[in-house]
Amino acid sequence: MPDDTQDVISGGHLVAKALKAEGVERIYTLCGGHIIDIYDGCVDEGIEVVDVRHEQVAAHAADGYARVTGKPGCAVVTAGPGTTDAVTGVANAFRAESPLLLIGGQGALTQHKMGSLQDLPHVDMMTPITKFAATVPDTARAADMVSMAFRECYHGAPGPSFLEIPRDVLDARVPAAKARVPRPGGYRASTRSAGDPEAVEKLADLLVHAEKPAILLGSQVWTTRATEAAVELVRTLNIPAYMNGAGRGTLPPGDPHHFQLSRRYAFSGADVIVIVGTPFDFRMGYGKRLSPDATVVQIDLDYRTVGKNRDIDLGIVGDAGLVLKAVTEAASGRLNGGASKRKEWLDELRAAEQTAIEKRLPHLRSDASPIHPYRLVSEINDFLTEDSIYIGDGGDIVTFSGQVVQPKAPGHWMDPGPLGTLGVGIPFVLAAKQARPDKEVVALFGDGAFSLTGWDFETLVRYDLPFVGIVGNNSSMNQIRYGQKAKYGEARERVGNTLGDVHYDRFAQMLGGYGEEVRDPADIGPALRRARESGKPSLINVWVDPDAYAPGTMNQTMYK
Protein backbone atom coordinates (compact mmCIF):
# COMPACT_ATOMS: atom_id res chain seq x y z
CA MET A 1 0.00 0.00 0.00
CA PRO A 2 1.48 3.38 -0.96
CA ASP A 3 1.80 6.02 1.73
CA ASP A 4 -0.85 8.31 0.26
CA THR A 5 -1.62 11.30 2.43
CA GLN A 6 -4.95 13.03 2.60
CA ASP A 7 -3.57 15.65 0.22
CA VAL A 8 -2.85 13.39 -2.78
CA ILE A 9 -4.51 10.34 -4.26
CA SER A 10 -3.66 7.91 -7.06
CA GLY A 11 -5.81 7.14 -10.07
CA GLY A 12 -6.42 3.58 -8.94
CA HIS A 13 -7.62 4.75 -5.55
CA LEU A 14 -9.90 7.30 -7.21
CA VAL A 15 -11.43 4.51 -9.28
CA ALA A 16 -12.02 2.47 -6.14
CA LYS A 17 -13.64 5.41 -4.36
CA ALA A 18 -15.94 5.93 -7.33
CA LEU A 19 -16.89 2.24 -7.39
CA LYS A 20 -17.64 2.39 -3.67
CA ALA A 21 -19.85 5.43 -4.20
CA GLU A 22 -21.76 3.51 -6.87
CA GLY A 23 -22.49 0.66 -4.49
CA VAL A 24 -20.02 -1.83 -5.97
CA GLU A 25 -19.33 -4.50 -3.36
CA ARG A 26 -16.90 -6.67 -5.32
CA ILE A 27 -15.00 -6.72 -8.58
CA TYR A 28 -14.33 -9.79 -10.71
CA THR A 29 -10.87 -9.88 -12.19
CA LEU A 30 -7.88 -11.73 -13.57
CA CYS A 31 -4.72 -9.97 -12.49
CA GLY A 32 -2.45 -7.96 -14.75
CA GLY A 33 0.28 -5.41 -14.25
CA HIS A 34 -1.69 -2.54 -15.75
CA ILE A 35 -4.47 -2.64 -13.13
CA ILE A 36 -2.91 -3.43 -9.76
CA ASP A 37 -3.38 0.09 -8.36
CA ILE A 38 -7.14 -0.46 -8.64
CA TYR A 39 -6.75 -3.55 -6.45
CA ASP A 40 -4.89 -1.51 -3.85
CA GLY A 41 -7.66 1.06 -3.84
CA CYS A 42 -10.33 -1.63 -3.52
CA VAL A 43 -8.59 -3.06 -0.45
CA ASP A 44 -8.69 0.38 1.18
CA GLU A 45 -12.35 0.88 0.26
CA GLY A 46 -13.51 -2.53 1.46
CA ILE A 47 -14.36 -3.79 -2.03
CA GLU A 48 -13.79 -7.52 -2.42
CA VAL A 49 -11.40 -8.55 -5.20
CA VAL A 50 -12.58 -11.88 -6.65
CA ASP A 51 -9.92 -13.46 -8.85
CA VAL A 52 -10.93 -15.94 -11.54
CA ARG A 53 -9.10 -18.00 -14.17
CA HIS A 54 -10.30 -16.32 -17.36
CA GLU A 55 -11.46 -12.81 -18.19
CA GLN A 56 -14.59 -14.11 -19.92
CA VAL A 57 -15.60 -15.52 -16.54
CA ALA A 58 -14.97 -12.15 -14.89
CA ALA A 59 -17.26 -10.37 -17.35
CA HIS A 60 -19.98 -13.04 -17.14
CA ALA A 61 -19.82 -12.94 -13.35
CA ALA A 62 -20.28 -9.16 -13.35
CA ASP A 63 -23.26 -9.65 -15.67
CA GLY A 64 -24.70 -12.34 -13.39
CA TYR A 65 -24.19 -10.23 -10.29
CA ALA A 66 -26.13 -7.36 -11.84
CA ARG A 67 -28.96 -9.68 -12.85
CA VAL A 68 -29.33 -11.20 -9.40
CA THR A 69 -29.03 -8.03 -7.34
CA GLY A 70 -30.01 -5.14 -9.57
CA LYS A 71 -26.79 -3.51 -8.32
CA PRO A 72 -23.82 -2.61 -10.50
CA GLY A 73 -21.67 -5.46 -11.75
CA CYS A 74 -18.00 -4.69 -12.29
CA ALA A 75 -15.10 -6.55 -13.87
CA VAL A 76 -11.51 -5.32 -14.08
CA VAL A 77 -9.12 -6.83 -16.63
CA THR A 78 -5.69 -6.04 -17.95
CA ALA A 79 -4.84 -4.63 -21.36
CA GLY A 80 -4.71 -6.42 -24.71
CA PRO A 81 -5.62 -10.10 -24.37
CA GLY A 82 -7.17 -9.42 -20.97
CA THR A 83 -9.67 -7.08 -22.56
CA THR A 84 -10.23 -9.15 -25.69
CA ASP A 85 -10.91 -12.20 -23.52
CA ALA A 86 -13.71 -10.24 -21.83
CA VAL A 87 -15.40 -9.20 -25.10
CA THR A 88 -17.78 -12.18 -25.17
CA GLY A 89 -19.00 -11.46 -21.65
CA VAL A 90 -19.63 -7.82 -22.48
CA ALA A 91 -21.42 -8.72 -25.72
CA ASN A 92 -23.64 -11.16 -23.85
CA ALA A 93 -24.56 -8.47 -21.32
CA PHE A 94 -25.24 -6.01 -24.14
CA ARG A 95 -27.80 -8.29 -25.78
CA ALA A 96 -29.29 -9.19 -22.40
CA GLU A 97 -29.62 -5.53 -21.31
CA SER A 98 -27.53 -6.17 -18.21
CA PRO A 99 -25.73 -3.23 -16.56
CA LEU A 100 -22.06 -3.75 -15.88
CA LEU A 101 -18.86 -1.77 -16.03
CA LEU A 102 -15.77 -3.36 -17.54
CA ILE A 103 -12.54 -1.55 -16.74
CA GLY A 104 -9.62 -2.45 -18.96
CA GLY A 105 -5.99 -1.55 -18.54
CA GLN A 106 -3.91 0.16 -21.22
CA GLY A 107 -0.29 1.08 -21.81
CA ALA A 108 0.94 4.45 -20.61
CA LEU A 109 -0.27 7.52 -22.47
CA THR A 110 3.36 8.52 -22.89
CA GLN A 111 3.85 5.32 -24.92
CA HIS A 112 0.72 5.66 -27.02
CA LYS A 113 1.16 4.13 -30.51
CA MET A 114 4.73 3.10 -29.65
CA GLY A 115 3.98 -0.62 -29.39
CA SER A 116 3.78 -0.86 -25.61
CA LEU A 117 3.00 -4.19 -23.98
CA GLN A 118 -0.55 -5.39 -24.79
CA ASP A 119 -1.50 -2.15 -26.54
CA LEU A 120 -4.71 -2.51 -28.59
CA PRO A 121 -7.52 -0.14 -29.65
CA HIS A 122 -9.85 -1.35 -26.90
CA VAL A 123 -12.38 1.48 -27.19
CA ASP A 124 -12.84 0.85 -30.90
CA MET A 125 -13.53 -2.83 -30.19
CA MET A 126 -15.94 -2.17 -27.34
CA THR A 127 -17.98 0.65 -28.85
CA PRO A 128 -20.41 -1.55 -30.85
CA ILE A 129 -21.25 -3.74 -27.82
CA THR A 130 -21.52 -1.12 -25.07
CA LYS A 131 -23.63 1.91 -24.30
CA PHE A 132 -20.50 3.91 -23.44
CA ALA A 133 -16.82 3.31 -24.18
CA ALA A 134 -14.05 5.79 -23.47
CA THR A 135 -10.45 6.33 -22.36
CA VAL A 136 -9.72 8.09 -19.08
CA PRO A 137 -7.27 10.79 -20.21
CA ASP A 138 -6.32 12.31 -16.87
CA THR A 139 -5.91 11.02 -13.32
CA ALA A 140 -8.03 13.75 -11.77
CA ARG A 141 -10.96 12.73 -13.97
CA ALA A 142 -10.87 9.00 -13.17
CA ALA A 143 -13.77 8.98 -10.71
CA ASP A 144 -15.78 11.41 -12.81
CA MET A 145 -15.55 9.11 -15.82
CA VAL A 146 -16.56 6.10 -13.74
CA SER A 147 -19.74 8.03 -12.94
CA MET A 148 -20.28 8.77 -16.64
CA ALA A 149 -20.00 5.07 -17.43
CA PHE A 150 -22.51 4.08 -14.77
CA ARG A 151 -24.91 6.81 -15.85
CA GLU A 152 -25.04 5.26 -19.31
CA CYS A 153 -25.41 1.76 -17.86
CA TYR A 154 -28.73 2.71 -16.32
CA HIS A 155 -30.18 5.19 -18.80
CA GLY A 156 -33.18 3.72 -20.65
CA ALA A 157 -32.69 0.04 -21.35
CA PRO A 158 -29.68 -0.93 -19.22
CA GLY A 159 -26.44 -2.30 -20.61
CA PRO A 160 -22.66 -2.43 -20.25
CA SER A 161 -20.09 0.35 -20.30
CA PHE A 162 -16.34 0.17 -20.85
CA LEU A 163 -13.53 2.33 -19.51
CA GLU A 164 -9.94 2.04 -20.68
CA ILE A 165 -7.49 3.46 -18.14
CA PRO A 166 -3.82 3.85 -19.09
CA ARG A 167 -1.23 2.62 -16.61
CA ASP A 168 0.31 6.03 -15.94
CA VAL A 169 -3.14 7.53 -15.34
CA LEU A 170 -3.80 4.88 -12.68
CA ASP A 171 -0.40 5.19 -11.03
CA ALA A 172 -0.12 8.98 -10.97
CA ARG A 173 -1.11 10.97 -7.90
CA VAL A 174 -3.00 14.22 -7.96
CA PRO A 175 -4.10 16.68 -5.29
CA ALA A 176 -7.23 15.24 -3.70
CA ALA A 177 -8.91 18.64 -3.97
CA LYS A 178 -8.77 18.42 -7.77
CA ALA A 179 -10.28 14.94 -7.94
CA ARG A 180 -14.06 14.96 -7.93
CA VAL A 181 -15.82 11.78 -6.73
CA PRO A 182 -19.47 12.24 -7.76
CA ARG A 183 -22.30 10.84 -5.68
CA PRO A 184 -24.87 8.92 -7.79
CA GLY A 185 -27.67 10.91 -6.20
CA GLY A 186 -25.88 14.09 -7.12
CA TYR A 187 -25.68 13.48 -10.85
CA ARG A 188 -28.06 10.69 -11.88
CA ALA A 189 -31.65 11.69 -12.64
CA SER A 190 -34.39 9.07 -12.83
CA THR A 191 -35.45 8.20 -16.36
CA ARG A 192 -38.26 5.84 -15.35
CA SER A 193 -41.42 6.52 -17.33
CA ALA A 194 -44.98 5.30 -16.85
CA GLY A 195 -45.62 5.68 -20.57
CA ASP A 196 -47.91 8.00 -22.48
CA PRO A 197 -51.15 8.42 -20.45
CA GLU A 198 -53.37 8.14 -23.53
CA ALA A 199 -51.68 4.90 -24.56
CA VAL A 200 -52.08 3.53 -21.04
CA GLU A 201 -55.82 4.31 -21.10
CA LYS A 202 -56.16 2.68 -24.49
CA LEU A 203 -54.42 -0.49 -23.29
CA ALA A 204 -56.62 -0.62 -20.20
CA ASP A 205 -59.71 -0.37 -22.41
CA LEU A 206 -58.42 -3.12 -24.71
CA LEU A 207 -57.83 -5.48 -21.80
CA VAL A 208 -61.16 -4.76 -20.14
CA HIS A 209 -63.09 -5.66 -23.30
CA ALA A 210 -60.89 -8.43 -24.70
CA GLU A 211 -62.41 -11.90 -24.76
CA LYS A 212 -59.17 -13.82 -25.30
CA PRO A 213 -56.23 -11.75 -24.07
CA ALA A 214 -52.73 -13.07 -23.42
CA ILE A 215 -49.61 -11.45 -21.99
CA LEU A 216 -45.93 -12.32 -22.27
CA LEU A 217 -43.74 -11.14 -19.39
CA GLY A 218 -40.13 -10.78 -20.53
CA SER A 219 -36.82 -10.05 -18.86
CA GLN A 220 -37.53 -6.37 -18.24
CA VAL A 221 -40.24 -7.39 -15.78
CA TRP A 222 -37.44 -8.66 -13.55
CA THR A 223 -34.77 -6.07 -14.36
CA THR A 224 -37.17 -3.21 -13.59
CA ARG A 225 -38.40 -5.08 -10.49
CA ALA A 226 -41.95 -5.04 -11.90
CA THR A 227 -43.02 -8.39 -10.46
CA GLU A 228 -45.64 -7.01 -8.09
CA ALA A 229 -47.21 -4.80 -10.75
CA ALA A 230 -47.26 -7.64 -13.29
CA VAL A 231 -48.88 -10.08 -10.88
CA GLU A 232 -51.48 -7.51 -9.84
CA LEU A 233 -52.44 -6.78 -13.45
CA VAL A 234 -52.67 -10.45 -14.43
CA ARG A 235 -54.78 -11.40 -11.43
CA THR A 236 -56.97 -8.31 -11.42
CA LEU A 237 -57.79 -8.58 -15.13
CA ASN A 238 -57.82 -12.38 -15.19
CA ILE A 239 -55.28 -12.72 -18.02
CA PRO A 240 -53.27 -15.84 -18.92
CA ALA A 241 -49.58 -15.09 -18.58
CA TYR A 242 -46.52 -16.56 -20.26
CA MET A 243 -42.96 -15.77 -19.19
CA ASN A 244 -39.58 -15.88 -20.90
CA GLY A 245 -35.99 -15.03 -20.05
CA ALA A 246 -35.53 -13.44 -16.64
CA GLY A 247 -39.30 -12.95 -16.51
CA ARG A 248 -39.68 -16.63 -15.60
CA GLY A 249 -40.87 -17.03 -12.04
CA THR A 250 -42.94 -13.84 -12.04
CA LEU A 251 -45.93 -16.05 -11.31
CA PRO A 252 -45.33 -19.20 -9.27
CA PRO A 253 -46.15 -22.65 -10.65
CA GLY A 254 -49.70 -23.58 -9.80
CA ASP A 255 -51.03 -20.05 -10.11
CA PRO A 256 -54.22 -20.22 -12.22
CA HIS A 257 -52.80 -17.56 -14.55
CA HIS A 258 -49.41 -19.24 -15.01
CA PHE A 259 -49.02 -20.95 -18.39
CA GLN A 260 -45.92 -22.44 -20.01
CA LEU A 261 -46.54 -24.93 -22.82
CA SER A 262 -49.48 -23.41 -24.71
CA ARG A 263 -47.97 -20.09 -25.81
CA ARG A 264 -48.08 -20.75 -29.53
CA TYR A 265 -51.68 -21.96 -29.22
CA ALA A 266 -52.64 -18.87 -27.22
CA PHE A 267 -50.93 -16.40 -29.53
CA SER A 268 -52.60 -17.92 -32.57
CA GLY A 269 -56.07 -17.49 -31.05
CA ALA A 270 -55.89 -14.43 -28.80
CA ASP A 271 -57.68 -11.21 -29.67
CA VAL A 272 -55.34 -8.97 -27.62
CA ILE A 273 -51.66 -9.83 -27.07
CA VAL A 274 -49.44 -7.75 -24.76
CA ILE A 275 -45.67 -8.18 -25.04
CA VAL A 276 -43.79 -6.76 -22.05
CA GLY A 277 -40.05 -6.21 -21.98
CA THR A 278 -38.88 -8.60 -24.68
CA PRO A 279 -38.16 -8.08 -28.39
CA PHE A 280 -39.61 -9.80 -31.44
CA ASP A 281 -36.39 -11.72 -31.98
CA PHE A 282 -35.70 -15.35 -32.91
CA ARG A 283 -37.24 -16.56 -29.64
CA MET A 284 -40.52 -15.00 -30.72
CA GLY A 285 -40.31 -16.09 -34.35
CA TYR A 286 -39.71 -12.39 -35.11
CA GLY A 287 -43.39 -11.79 -34.28
CA LYS A 288 -44.70 -13.97 -37.11
CA ARG A 289 -46.34 -16.48 -34.76
CA LEU A 290 -48.82 -13.95 -33.42
CA SER A 291 -52.32 -14.06 -34.85
CA PRO A 292 -52.68 -11.55 -37.70
CA ASP A 293 -56.14 -10.76 -36.35
CA ALA A 294 -54.95 -9.92 -32.83
CA THR A 295 -54.46 -6.42 -31.48
CA VAL A 296 -50.78 -6.42 -30.50
CA VAL A 297 -49.37 -4.14 -27.81
CA GLN A 298 -45.68 -3.87 -26.97
CA ILE A 299 -44.21 -2.28 -23.83
CA ASP A 300 -40.45 -1.73 -23.67
CA LEU A 301 -37.80 0.52 -22.17
CA ASP A 302 -36.21 1.04 -25.58
CA TYR A 303 -38.15 2.84 -28.30
CA ARG A 304 -36.04 1.05 -30.91
CA THR A 305 -37.43 -2.31 -29.82
CA VAL A 306 -41.08 -1.33 -30.09
CA GLY A 307 -42.49 -2.52 -33.42
CA LYS A 308 -39.16 -3.93 -34.61
CA ASN A 309 -39.62 -6.92 -36.98
CA ARG A 310 -43.43 -6.77 -36.71
CA ASP A 311 -46.03 -4.05 -36.93
CA ILE A 312 -47.93 -3.43 -33.72
CA ASP A 313 -51.19 -1.70 -32.92
CA LEU A 314 -50.03 0.13 -29.80
CA GLY A 315 -46.56 0.83 -28.46
CA ILE A 316 -45.67 2.12 -25.02
CA VAL A 317 -42.14 3.15 -24.10
CA GLY A 318 -41.65 2.97 -20.37
CA ASP A 319 -40.74 1.10 -17.23
CA ALA A 320 -42.66 -2.18 -17.11
CA GLY A 321 -43.63 -1.81 -13.46
CA LEU A 322 -44.88 1.76 -13.75
CA VAL A 323 -46.75 1.08 -16.99
CA LEU A 324 -48.46 -2.09 -15.75
CA LYS A 325 -49.42 -0.45 -12.47
CA ALA A 326 -50.95 2.47 -14.36
CA VAL A 327 -52.88 0.10 -16.65
CA THR A 328 -54.29 -1.81 -13.68
CA GLU A 329 -55.39 1.42 -12.00
CA ALA A 330 -57.00 2.65 -15.21
CA ALA A 331 -58.89 -0.63 -15.65
CA SER A 332 -60.03 -1.07 -12.06
CA GLY A 333 -63.71 -0.52 -11.45
CA ARG A 334 -64.78 -1.30 -15.02
CA LEU A 335 -64.08 -4.99 -15.41
CA ASN A 336 -66.81 -5.98 -17.81
CA GLY A 337 -67.15 -6.89 -21.47
CA GLY A 338 -64.87 -9.76 -22.36
CA ALA A 339 -63.69 -10.31 -18.79
CA SER A 340 -66.80 -12.30 -17.93
CA LYS A 341 -66.01 -14.86 -20.66
CA ARG A 342 -62.40 -15.47 -19.73
CA LYS A 343 -63.02 -18.61 -17.73
CA GLU A 344 -63.71 -20.43 -20.98
CA TRP A 345 -60.50 -19.03 -22.47
CA LEU A 346 -58.42 -19.99 -19.44
CA ASP A 347 -59.95 -23.49 -19.45
CA GLU A 348 -59.16 -23.82 -23.15
CA LEU A 349 -55.52 -22.92 -22.57
CA ARG A 350 -55.28 -25.22 -19.56
CA ALA A 351 -56.53 -28.07 -21.73
CA ALA A 352 -53.86 -27.24 -24.32
CA GLU A 353 -51.25 -27.29 -21.55
CA GLN A 354 -52.43 -30.70 -20.41
CA THR A 355 -52.27 -32.05 -23.95
CA ALA A 356 -48.67 -30.87 -24.25
CA ILE A 357 -47.76 -32.46 -20.92
CA GLU A 358 -49.38 -35.77 -21.85
CA LYS A 359 -47.45 -35.78 -25.12
CA ARG A 360 -44.18 -35.50 -23.17
CA LEU A 361 -45.22 -37.76 -20.29
CA PRO A 362 -43.64 -41.00 -21.59
CA HIS A 363 -40.26 -39.24 -21.78
CA LEU A 364 -40.73 -37.41 -18.47
CA ARG A 365 -41.17 -40.78 -16.76
CA SER A 366 -38.86 -42.81 -18.97
CA ASP A 367 -36.68 -45.42 -17.26
CA ALA A 368 -34.47 -45.81 -20.32
CA SER A 369 -30.70 -45.71 -20.21
CA PRO A 370 -29.02 -43.63 -21.56
CA ILE A 371 -31.34 -41.25 -19.76
CA HIS A 372 -33.83 -39.20 -21.74
CA PRO A 373 -33.18 -35.47 -21.22
CA TYR A 374 -36.85 -34.92 -20.36
CA ARG A 375 -36.50 -37.33 -17.43
CA LEU A 376 -33.40 -35.49 -16.23
CA VAL A 377 -34.97 -32.03 -16.30
CA SER A 378 -38.15 -33.39 -14.72
CA GLU A 379 -36.10 -34.70 -11.80
CA ILE A 380 -34.34 -31.33 -11.52
CA ASN A 381 -37.66 -29.50 -11.49
CA ASP A 382 -38.90 -31.74 -8.67
CA PHE A 383 -35.66 -31.08 -6.78
CA LEU A 384 -35.93 -27.28 -6.82
CA THR A 385 -37.23 -25.43 -3.77
CA GLU A 386 -38.54 -21.90 -3.34
CA ASP A 387 -34.97 -20.88 -2.49
CA SER A 388 -33.34 -22.43 -5.56
CA ILE A 389 -31.83 -20.16 -8.20
CA TYR A 390 -31.74 -22.20 -11.41
CA ILE A 391 -29.07 -21.59 -14.05
CA GLY A 392 -29.16 -23.11 -17.53
CA ASP A 393 -25.95 -23.24 -19.58
CA GLY A 394 -26.12 -25.25 -22.77
CA GLY A 395 -27.85 -25.80 -26.09
CA ASP A 396 -30.15 -28.76 -26.53
CA ILE A 397 -30.23 -29.79 -22.87
CA VAL A 398 -31.26 -26.31 -21.75
CA THR A 399 -33.90 -26.20 -24.49
CA PHE A 400 -35.38 -29.30 -22.85
CA SER A 401 -35.24 -27.64 -19.44
CA GLY A 402 -37.02 -24.53 -20.67
CA GLN A 403 -40.15 -26.61 -21.26
CA VAL A 404 -40.12 -28.34 -17.88
CA VAL A 405 -38.19 -26.44 -15.22
CA GLN A 406 -40.33 -23.86 -13.42
CA PRO A 407 -38.59 -21.50 -10.99
CA LYS A 408 -40.59 -20.97 -7.85
CA ALA A 409 -39.94 -17.23 -7.46
CA PRO A 410 -38.96 -14.16 -9.50
CA GLY A 411 -35.27 -13.70 -10.20
CA HIS A 412 -34.63 -17.41 -9.76
CA TRP A 413 -34.05 -18.25 -13.44
CA MET A 414 -30.81 -17.39 -15.22
CA ASP A 415 -29.81 -18.17 -18.79
CA PRO A 416 -27.46 -16.45 -21.24
CA GLY A 417 -30.14 -14.35 -22.90
CA PRO A 418 -30.61 -13.69 -26.61
CA LEU A 419 -26.93 -13.97 -27.56
CA GLY A 420 -27.06 -17.65 -26.60
CA THR A 421 -23.55 -17.66 -25.18
CA LEU A 422 -22.29 -21.00 -23.89
CA GLY A 423 -20.11 -20.93 -20.79
CA VAL A 424 -22.14 -18.58 -18.58
CA GLY A 425 -22.97 -21.30 -16.05
CA ILE A 426 -19.94 -21.34 -13.76
CA PRO A 427 -19.58 -17.52 -13.67
CA PHE A 428 -23.32 -17.12 -13.03
CA VAL A 429 -23.02 -19.64 -10.17
CA LEU A 430 -20.12 -17.60 -8.76
CA ALA A 431 -22.10 -14.37 -8.95
CA ALA A 432 -25.39 -15.78 -7.69
CA LYS A 433 -23.88 -17.56 -4.72
CA GLN A 434 -21.82 -14.55 -3.68
CA ALA A 435 -24.74 -12.18 -4.13
CA ARG A 436 -27.27 -14.43 -2.40
CA PRO A 437 -25.44 -16.82 -0.05
CA ASP A 438 -28.80 -17.64 1.54
CA LYS A 439 -30.03 -19.19 -1.72
CA GLU A 440 -29.38 -22.63 -3.12
CA VAL A 441 -27.92 -22.50 -6.62
CA VAL A 442 -28.68 -25.32 -9.06
CA ALA A 443 -27.01 -25.30 -12.47
CA LEU A 444 -27.60 -27.53 -15.49
CA PHE A 445 -24.77 -27.68 -18.02
CA GLY A 446 -24.44 -29.23 -21.40
CA ASP A 447 -21.10 -31.00 -21.57
CA GLY A 448 -20.03 -28.69 -24.37
CA ALA A 449 -21.01 -25.55 -22.46
CA PHE A 450 -19.29 -26.66 -19.25
CA SER A 451 -16.06 -27.20 -21.16
CA LEU A 452 -15.78 -23.50 -22.02
CA THR A 453 -15.41 -22.11 -18.49
CA GLY A 454 -15.25 -25.25 -16.37
CA TRP A 455 -11.82 -24.57 -14.89
CA ASP A 456 -13.38 -21.87 -12.74
CA PHE A 457 -15.04 -24.68 -10.81
CA GLU A 458 -11.77 -24.36 -8.88
CA THR A 459 -12.70 -20.75 -8.10
CA LEU A 460 -15.94 -21.96 -6.52
CA VAL A 461 -13.98 -24.45 -4.42
CA ARG A 462 -11.43 -21.80 -3.44
CA TYR A 463 -14.16 -19.40 -2.31
CA ASP A 464 -16.14 -22.21 -0.63
CA LEU A 465 -19.31 -21.63 -2.66
CA PRO A 466 -21.43 -24.80 -2.63
CA PHE A 467 -23.88 -25.44 -5.45
CA VAL A 468 -25.59 -28.37 -7.11
CA GLY A 469 -24.30 -28.83 -10.65
CA ILE A 470 -25.54 -31.30 -13.23
CA VAL A 471 -23.82 -32.09 -16.53
CA GLY A 472 -26.14 -33.56 -19.16
CA ASN A 473 -23.44 -35.58 -20.88
CA ASN A 474 -24.02 -36.90 -24.40
CA SER A 475 -20.40 -36.50 -25.54
CA SER A 476 -21.53 -34.12 -28.26
CA MET A 477 -22.51 -30.58 -29.16
CA ASN A 478 -25.89 -32.10 -29.83
CA GLN A 479 -27.85 -29.08 -30.98
CA ILE A 480 -25.40 -28.59 -33.82
CA ARG A 481 -25.23 -32.31 -34.48
CA TYR A 482 -28.97 -32.34 -35.10
CA GLY A 483 -28.65 -29.51 -37.61
CA GLN A 484 -25.90 -31.28 -39.51
CA LYS A 485 -27.87 -34.51 -39.54
CA ALA A 486 -31.00 -32.73 -40.79
CA LYS A 487 -29.17 -30.84 -43.56
CA TYR A 488 -26.43 -33.22 -44.66
CA GLY A 489 -27.47 -36.70 -43.54
CA GLU A 490 -26.24 -39.23 -41.00
CA ALA A 491 -22.90 -39.74 -42.74
CA ARG A 492 -21.88 -36.17 -41.86
CA GLU A 493 -23.69 -35.57 -38.59
CA ARG A 494 -20.56 -35.99 -36.46
CA VAL A 495 -18.29 -33.49 -38.19
CA GLY A 496 -16.81 -30.99 -35.74
CA ASN A 497 -19.22 -31.63 -32.87
CA THR A 498 -18.06 -34.81 -31.14
CA LEU A 499 -16.66 -34.67 -27.60
CA GLY A 500 -14.92 -37.32 -25.53
CA ASP A 501 -16.64 -39.43 -22.88
CA VAL A 502 -15.45 -37.20 -20.07
CA HIS A 503 -16.18 -38.04 -16.43
CA TYR A 504 -17.00 -34.56 -15.13
CA ASP A 505 -17.72 -36.04 -11.70
CA ARG A 506 -14.05 -36.97 -11.42
CA PHE A 507 -13.05 -33.51 -12.59
CA ALA A 508 -15.05 -32.03 -9.70
CA GLN A 509 -13.44 -34.43 -7.23
CA MET A 510 -9.97 -33.60 -8.51
CA LEU A 511 -10.55 -29.90 -7.81
CA GLY A 512 -11.90 -30.52 -4.30
CA GLY A 513 -15.62 -30.65 -4.99
CA TYR A 514 -18.25 -33.37 -4.84
CA GLY A 515 -18.80 -35.59 -7.88
CA GLU A 516 -21.08 -38.49 -8.74
CA GLU A 517 -21.92 -40.42 -11.89
CA VAL A 518 -25.50 -41.36 -12.86
CA ARG A 519 -26.55 -43.84 -15.55
CA ASP A 520 -29.90 -45.01 -14.13
CA PRO A 521 -32.73 -42.43 -14.03
CA ALA A 522 -33.84 -43.76 -10.65
CA ASP A 523 -30.53 -42.53 -9.22
CA ILE A 524 -30.91 -38.89 -10.30
CA GLY A 525 -32.95 -37.68 -7.33
CA PRO A 526 -30.79 -39.36 -4.67
CA ALA A 527 -27.63 -38.06 -6.35
CA LEU A 528 -28.97 -34.50 -6.34
CA ARG A 529 -29.80 -34.77 -2.65
CA ARG A 530 -26.34 -36.10 -1.83
CA ALA A 531 -24.79 -33.20 -3.74
CA ARG A 532 -26.89 -30.76 -1.72
CA GLU A 533 -25.90 -32.43 1.54
CA SER A 534 -22.20 -32.43 0.64
CA GLY A 535 -21.92 -28.69 1.24
CA LYS A 536 -19.43 -28.45 -1.63
CA PRO A 537 -19.41 -27.30 -5.22
CA SER A 538 -20.67 -30.39 -7.02
CA LEU A 539 -21.07 -31.99 -10.43
CA ILE A 540 -23.44 -34.87 -11.11
CA ASN A 541 -22.38 -36.42 -14.41
CA VAL A 542 -25.60 -37.73 -16.01
CA TRP A 543 -25.25 -39.76 -19.20
CA VAL A 544 -28.12 -38.68 -21.45
CA ASP A 545 -29.41 -40.09 -24.72
CA PRO A 546 -27.46 -38.52 -27.61
CA ASP A 547 -30.28 -39.38 -30.04
CA ALA A 548 -32.94 -37.39 -28.17
CA TYR A 549 -33.41 -33.84 -29.46
CA ALA A 550 -35.49 -31.05 -27.97
CA PRO A 551 -38.52 -29.92 -30.02
CA GLY A 552 -37.12 -26.39 -29.94
CA THR A 553 -33.93 -27.62 -31.56
CA MET A 554 -35.80 -29.48 -34.29
CA ASN A 555 -37.97 -26.44 -35.00
CA GLN A 556 -35.08 -24.01 -35.54
CA THR A 557 -35.39 -22.45 -38.97
CA MET A 558 -31.63 -22.54 -39.57
CA TYR A 559 -31.88 -26.31 -39.86
CA LYS A 560 -34.61 -26.26 -42.49
PLM region spans:
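Glycine-rich, acidic loop regions that bind phosphate or pyrophosphate groups
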Residues: 104-145, 243-348
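Active-site nucleophile and cofactor-binding loops and adjacent substrate-binding regions
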Residues: 30-32, 50-60, 75-82, 137-138, ...
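Phosphate/pyrophosphate-binding active-site segments
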Residues: 2-6, 140, 293-394, 521-522, ...
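A short, small-residue-rich loop immediately preceding and capping a beta-strand
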Residues: 19, 25-29, 48-50, 68-107, ...
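Active-site diphosphate/adenylate-binding microenvironment
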Residues: 15, 30-33, 38-40, 350-427, ...
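Thiamine diphosphate
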Residues: 103, 111-118, 264-267, 307-309, ...
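Glycine-rich phosphate/diphosphate-binding loops that line cofactor/substrate pockets in enzymes
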Residues: 13-24, 64-70, 94, 152-156, ...
